[in-house]
Each structure stands twice: as structure tokens, then as C-alpha cells.
């Protein structure tokens, strides 16, 4: 888009890591994501306070969020979370609209993240064994195509690097 700045790439401390699947005795896969607060901060930083706005619309039972910069709107649909369905759906729609503006789009280049079970503690919740420890993105770098070229994730409790990736 001519005249509009490209949002900067995400810093390591702006990226959250959450367990997406756990296989007992083997390990867990981890997904990277950004929060809606990160989108708001980057919109403010890139375009200025008051230079952007957002709106929500319900279409066929789905909640859409649009973000406008200089009168140009980009929309996307949200998916509710299990915890707080409406708030989660609104937040998800906002983050997805942020992706449409290029905020955090580099996360789509994330490698598959697998952490072996010997790298984290587990606990039992409702009779089911689950990971107890949290994971943190501690280092991230990007190439000239805005793709992840280097990634390190550490166990927040032990501070041990539990995943490393270098793009060939």
C-alpha cells in the first residue's frame, strides 16, 4: 500500500508460546502467537495514536473485526476461546485483522516446535497428565523476506533452552 508504513517485526518478548498438544511419555508441540495488546502497541507505534480505529460486526453468527488506517479497512473473523467465548472471539478477530495489516505475519513461518518430555515438568489435572512448565521465546531473528531464520525457546522455570531452530 503506497504511503502506508509496514509494521515492524515482532520482538521475542512480544511472542507467546503455548502447548498445543501433549503426548504422554514423548513431549509436546508448541504454537507461537501474539496478543491483541501487541497489535495495539504496534498500530500506535507504526501509524500513531488516533491514526487507526477498529470496529466489530456480526455476520451470519460470526464476529468480525476491522482495523482502519487512513480510511482503509481490513477485516477478519474471530474464533471463540473455551474460557471466555465472547471476549476470546473479539480478541481473536482483532488479532486476525492485525495479521491482515502485516502485524505478526512472520509467525506463519514458524517451524514445527517439538519439546521432548524430559525438558519439562508435568502435573495431573482432572486425572490427566499435562505439562506444568511454561515456555518463553528468548531469541528470534528474521531473514530479508521477513521469515523466521533463528528461534530459541526456553523453559520459563528451569531457564534451559529446550528448542533451537536455524533456517537453512
Descriptions of predicted regions:
Residues 1-29:
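N-terminal, Lys/Arg- and Ser/Thr-rich interaction peptides
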Residues 34-168:
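Positively charged, aromatic-enriched nucleic acid-contacting surfaces
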Amino acid at each position: 500500500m503506497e504511503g502506508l508504513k509496514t509494521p515492524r517485526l515482532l520482538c521475542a518478548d512480544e511472542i507467546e508460546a503455548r502447548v498445543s498438544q501433549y503426548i504422554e511419555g514423548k513431549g509436546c508441540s508448541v504454537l507461537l502467537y501474539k496478543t491483541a495488546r501487541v497489535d495495539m502497541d504496534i498500530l500506535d507505534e507504526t501509524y500513531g495514536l488516533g491514526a487507526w480505529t477498529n470496529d466489530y460486526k456480526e455476520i451470519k453468527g460470526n464476529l468480525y473485526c476491522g482495523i482502519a488506517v487512513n480510511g482503509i479497512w481490513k477485516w477478519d473473523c474471530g474464533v471463540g476461546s473455551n474460557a471466555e467465548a465472547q471476549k476470546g472471539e473479539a480478541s481473536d478477530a482483532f488479532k486476525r485483522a492485525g495479521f491482515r495489516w502485516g502485524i505478526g505475519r512472520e509467525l506463519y513461518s514458524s517451524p514445527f516446535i517439538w519439546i521432548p518430555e524430559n525438558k519439562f515438568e508435568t502435573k495431573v489435572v482432572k486425572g490427566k497428565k499435562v505439562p506444568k512448565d511454561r515456555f518463553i521465546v528468548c531469541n528470534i531473528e528474521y531473514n530479508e523476506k521477513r521469515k523466521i531464520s533463528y528461534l530459541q525457546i526456553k523453559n520459563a522455570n528451569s531457564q534451559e533452552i529446550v528448542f533451537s531452530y536455524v533456517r537453512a
